[in-house]
Amino acid sequence: MTRRKTGSGIRMKERLQKLLSAAGVCSRRAAEGYITAGRVTVNGETALLGQQADPETDDIRVDGVPLGREPEAVYLMLNKPRGYVTTVSDEQGRKTVMDLLTGVSTRVYPVGRLDRDSEGLLLLTNDGALTHRLLHPSHEVSKEYRVTVSGPVEHAAERLSRVRDVVGLPIRPAEVRELSRKGNRAELSVIIHEGRNRQIRRMCAQCGLEVLRLQRVREHCLELGTLPLGQWRYLTAEEIAGLKEE
C-alpha cells in the first residue's frame, strides 16, 4: 500500500488485485489472470501485475467497464462453422469463435463448447449466473444435434440410445431417432442432457459409426433456425426469458 499526499489529505493506493477483489469482480488470484491477460486498464493504459492504483482518483476498468459498475448483460447466438475452437484465445494460434463476433463491443464468453470439427448453435454471454445455471449438471439442459454417420447404420438409433457410459463415465440415455438413411449413411437426431467431452462422437465410436457431420440445432429453448453459418445475432427478450426460467 502506498500513501500519496493530495491537496485534501492523504489517499491510499493499493494493488489492483485487492481492489478488484474488494469490488466483487473476482478473487485476488483470478485478478492476477485478468491483469496478465490485459483485461484491466488504469487511466487508459493496460495494467501491469503488481501495479497500484487509487479507486477514487484513477480510472480503473475491467473489460472496458469502470470498476464498481456492472456491465450490461449481453446474450447472443452464433452459428459456429467447423475449424474454429470454442475459446476466447488459443495459444496455438488457431481460429477461435471470437474471430466471428465482428461488431460486438462487449466482452462475452462461450457457454459450454462445440469441438473444432463440430458446428451449429453456440450461446455466448457475459451473464455469469446464467452460464453457471446452464452448465450445472443438476439443471439437465437438453441439447439437440443433427448427426450424419456412416458404417453399420441399421438400428443405429437403437444402439446409440443404449449407450450408458463414455470413457468409463456414466451418462443418461440419449434420445435418438433416425431422420433418414441411404446405403451405409444415416442422419440422426440426438438429444443429450449432459456435456461430456466429445460425448456424441464417443458414443458413435462405441457403435462402430463414423461421424461425418455434427451440428447442434437446439439448446434448451434456443433453436438455430435459419441463422447463416458463421453469423451471429442477439437473442430476443422472449429467448432470454426462456433461458432464465426454472
Regions found by a protein language model. Give the residues of each.
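Basic, flexible Lys/Arg- and Gly-enriched helix-loop patches that mediate nucleic-acid binding at interfaces
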Residues: 3-246
